[in-house]
Amino acid sequence: MSSNIFGSVPILVVVAIQLLLVHNVSSQNVTNDYLNHQCNNTQGRYTHGSTFEKNLNQVLHNISNLDLRYGYAYVSNVVAYKVSKDPNIVFVLLQCRGDSFGSKCHSCLSTAVSGLRERCPGNRGATIWYDQCLLEISSVDSEGRIHYKRMFYMQNPTNVTNDPKRFEDKRRDLLHKLMLEATKDSKENGAKGLLYAVGEMRIGRNKMYAMVQCTQDLWQTGCHVCLEWITQMKYGEFFYRKPGGRVCGRSCSFRYELYPFLRR
């Protein structure tokens, strides 16, 4: 899949058609495939041995030393980055899928760092997606913002033929239920949770499996807005009659399949 400049289209629409066949459930279907990347040419480039590169390497090293027990990190080389004027400031966001925390998140981080260096060498801003994590490097602070332009969708090329309207109603109901689950307060202390939810629903002889997730720099309200945007407003029509599909974004994502694709 080719790289894309962030500002080239109103909403990045990358249709990566995948043949998502139903696999043996015992295989768990847990993969960490490369999905897409975006090289942000508007932020400029850095050279080998530059201060920016040294700062970037240090931030990535600092993240690799975290336990990543909650699968998330947003780290800069400057403590007071909200008011810093440093031209070589670096921001790195890592968000791992909700079933890929801890050591699994570390593994995906390593893969993503290598992938980003290969696909966007020298870019001061870039994002890469894998099945189990999202990694973004940037020279601009983007914490807490909903990024509507940095997203793409993937869908199963086949169509549901048996009662497609009922299938669509069930799909929407499940994703809506998971959106509410992901954005509710934590039961322990009323704070925000992990902004992640998984579920399943019986549809005739089949069972649908789904997940929704937001990056943890958002709060519940922002997460709800982002998930509503990708599940209903912007991309909902693209999945009519599709037995599997996903939207991957910088701020939120969802996926549904007719086979389990997450760790138990």
Curated annotation (Swiss-Prot):
Keywords assigned by UniProt, alphabetized: Repeat, Secreted, Signal
Gene3D superfamilies from the UniProt entry: Gnk2 domain, C-X8-C-X2-C motif
Primary location recorded for the protein, binned into one broad class: secreted
Signal peptide (from-to): 1-27
Protein origin, superkingdom: Eukaryota
A matching Pfam family: Stress-antifung
Locations listed in the record: Secreted
UniProt entry tagged with the keyword Repeat: yes
GO cellular component, one term: extracellular region
PROSITE patterns membership: GNK2
Domain Gnk2-homologous, residue spans: 34-142, 148-261
Similarity field: Belongs to the cysteine-rich repeat secretory protein family.
Protein name: Cysteine-rich repeat secretory protein 26
Organism, scientific name: Arabidopsis thaliana (Mouse-ear cress)
